[in-house]
A protein has these predicted regions:
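Conserved small/polar residues in nucleotide/adenosyl-binding loops
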Residues: 225-229
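A short, well-structured edge-of-sheet supersecondary motif
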Residues: 10-40, 72
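Extended ligand-binding groove/face enriched in aromatic
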Residues: 47-49, 79, 83-137
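Active-site helix/loop module of the DD-peptidase/beta-lactamase fold
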Residues: 66-105, 157-210
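Catalytic-site signature segments of enzymes, centered on catalytic residues
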Residues: 42, 110-188, 210, 215-219
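Acidic, glycine-rich loop-and-strand cores that form catalytic or ligand-binding grooves
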Residues: 230-236
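Active-site SXXK
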Residues: 29, 47-72, 100, 151-155
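Short alpha-helical patches at coil-to-helix transitions and adjacent helical residues
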Residues: 51-57, 94, 144-148, 221-224
Length: 236
């Protein structure tokens, strides 16, 4: 490897990116580079933000494989029989799991949506209420935080288990990964501290006990590499 380029990379990380704790680089399955930064080490667990969505997608795949979900093109509304559709929202009745996973669904976001989301007790219902009526199904619209929780709701309703327990049995434990706790916040300060921490191990849940699907999971650099390797094995 080009040592000059490596030194430049490390200098940039050490001076500009205090949220990076580790990098592992592989080529043909062989580790070519591994280093840790900003007080991190091989066991440091940090909030992986939107990587959580990829983990949820893997869990949806496992649920499909095990027969909990029949097919990826099922309508999401079918998994929430008690949800009351508001204002004759036709779009929400057409949206599928595939649409959710590919982020090609319309949302009715407003400026204060995030404050209301974080202070609401039921993130799944909150997300369902924002679906449809604005935009078109099939057009990409990135969902930073609000929305993916619907997939968590589907996993809970189909498996009869928490996302945390389902993931622990079928993904984390088989790979030797330990996600310890279900995390809740009692204040904004606690949430901000979580986003910056390098030693918190767990997965955020709402007041209903549903794991966040668009954010909220912590993993170590090694754990992410392990999941990456297993995913590639299944693809090829």
């Amino acid at each position: 490897m080009n040592q000059e380029k490596i030194m430049q990379l490390e200098e940039i990380i050490n001076t500009k990116y205090d949220n990076i704790t580790g990098i592992i680089g592989l080529k043909n399955g062989v580790t070519k580079y591994e280093n840790y930064f900003n007080g991190g080490n091989v066991n440091s667990t940090v909030h992986v933000a939107s990587v959580t969505k990829s983990i949820i997608s893997i869990l949806i795949g496992i649920a499909l494989d095990k027969g909990y979900i029949e097919k990826i093109d099922q309508k999401i509304i079918d998994f929430f029989p008690n949800y009351v559709i508001k204002n004759n929202n036709l779009a929400i009745q057409k949206i599928t799991i595939r649409d959710m996973m590919t982020m090609t669904v319309p949302y009715k976001y407003q400026e204060d949506s995030y404050i209301k989301y974080f202070t609401s007790k039921d993130w799944v219902t909150f997300s369902l209420n924002l679906l449809g009526d604005c935009g078109e199904i099939g057009k990409f619209q990135y969902a930073p935080l609000i929305g993916p929780d619907i997939l968590s709701g589907i996993l809970v309703n189909t498996t009869g288990r928490s996302v945390f327990d389902f993931a622990t049995e079928y993904l984390f434990t088989p790979l030797g990964i330990e996600v310890k706790d279900k995390i809740t916040f009692s204040s904004e300060e606690e949430q901000v501290a979580f986003l910056k921490a390098k030693d918190i191990n767990g997965w955020v849940i709402d007041s209903c006990g549903i794991n966040a699907a668009g954010w909220g999971l912590t993993l170590s650099t090694g754990a992410k590499m392990c999941i990456r390797d297993r995913s590639i094995q299944h693809i090829y």
